Amino acid sequence: MNITDIRTKSPLVLTYANFVTPQFVANVVNVVGASPLMSRELAEFKELAGIANAVIINTGTLQKVEINDIIKLSQEAYQLGKPVVLDPVAVSVPFRSKAITQFLASGHVDVIRGNAAEIAWFADIDFASQGIDATGKGDVIEIAQRAAKKTGAVIALSGACDVVSDGQYTQTLDINVEQLSSIVGTGDALSSLIGAFIADGLKVPNVMNAMATFKLAGQKAATKTNQPGSFTNQLLDELFVIDNIDVQNFVKESVLNHG
């Protein structure tokens, strides 16, 4: 989908949300024209997965008792043919590493969205990180490609240089918007936004369109303010009015294809 399709069809994006950023995530999904829905209740997963167009699983505040829940949700989505996006927040922390390993063994995932440090974990590449922010340096293209090949998922690596790869075909967007890293929840929001863009089909360009839309909106917002509070509001405003022609021009000018 592109932004025009989303506003016309209003896909329902179901997010298994953490309890830190759900309102911001819902606002981002809503302002682009999609319909956000949050749930952490196992009893309704089958019904909600049935009506959703995409399912996002965010492990930012995952607890041990919830591991089987996210596996079940991903299985329900898979059986119904709904794309699943995994946001493995701080996956290199031992408890989270174990939980995600268990999830990958028994659950289902179509897209993994994370920062460079998080994606490097899936690629078995050492990468310095601190909390939710990646601070190490490495070849992000290689990291994304290796992670895609190891997991079988499309990888969406976000940061100063965004990379989307299925292991064979890779796209990059090398434009840094520093203000996006000043707000807690931009990664969470991007993961759910990707869900809206892949609601009618999982393709690398669809995932990149989501990332380009988010980064272009951030770039526009940054020209108007660099204060985190006002930037948050301006980002939502830019996403609300962003035009598909602007996004496609941005993609043509800034996105590079690799293989």
Curated annotation (Swiss-Prot):
Single GO molecular-function term? ATP binding
Q: Which residues of this UniProt protein bind substrate?
A: M38, G185
Q: Which reaction does it catalyse?
A: 5-(2-hydroxyethyl)-4-methylthiazole + ATP = 4-methyl-5-(2-phosphooxyethyl)-thiazole + ADP + H(+)
Record-linked Gene3D superfamilies: 3.40.1190.20
Iron-sulfur as a keyword of this entry, yes or no, is: no
Q: Which residues hold ATP?
A: R113, S158
EC numbers on record:
2.7.1.50
Which superkingdom heads the taxonomic lineage of this protein's source? Bacteria
Tell me the cofactors it needs.
Mg(2+)
GO annotation terms (biological process): thiamine biosynthetic process; thiamine diphosphate biosynthetic process
Write out the pathway annotation from the protein's UniProt entry: Cofactor biosynthesis; thiamine diphosphate biosynthesis; 4-methyl-5-(2-phosphoethyl)-thiazole from 5-(2-hydroxyethyl)-4-methylthiazole: step 1/1
Enzyme class (EC, first level):
transferase
Instruction: Report keywords, A-Z.
Output: ATP-binding, Kinase, Magnesium, Metal-binding, Nucleotide-binding, Thiamine biosynthesis, Transferase
Which InterPro entries would you find in this protein's record? Hyethyz_kinase (IPR000417), Ribokinase-like (IPR029056)
HAMAP family annotated for this entry? Thz_kinase
The entry's family comment says: Belongs to the Thz kinase family.
Purpose of the protein: Catalyzes the phosphorylation of the hydroxyl group of 4-methyl-5-beta-hydroxyethylthiazole (THZ).
Q: Which NCBIfam families match?
A: PRK09355.1
Q: What is this protein called?
A: Hydroxyethylthiazole kinase 1
Q: Which organism is it from?
A: Leuconostoc mesenteroides subsp. mesenteroides (strain ATCC 8293 / DSM 20343 / BCRC 11652 / CCM 1803 / JCM 6124 / NCDO 523 / NBRC 100496 / NCIMB 8023 / NCTC 12954 / NRRL B-1118 / 37Y)
Q: What lineage is this protein's organism placed in?
A: Bacteria, Bacillati, Bacillota, Bacilli, Lactobacillales
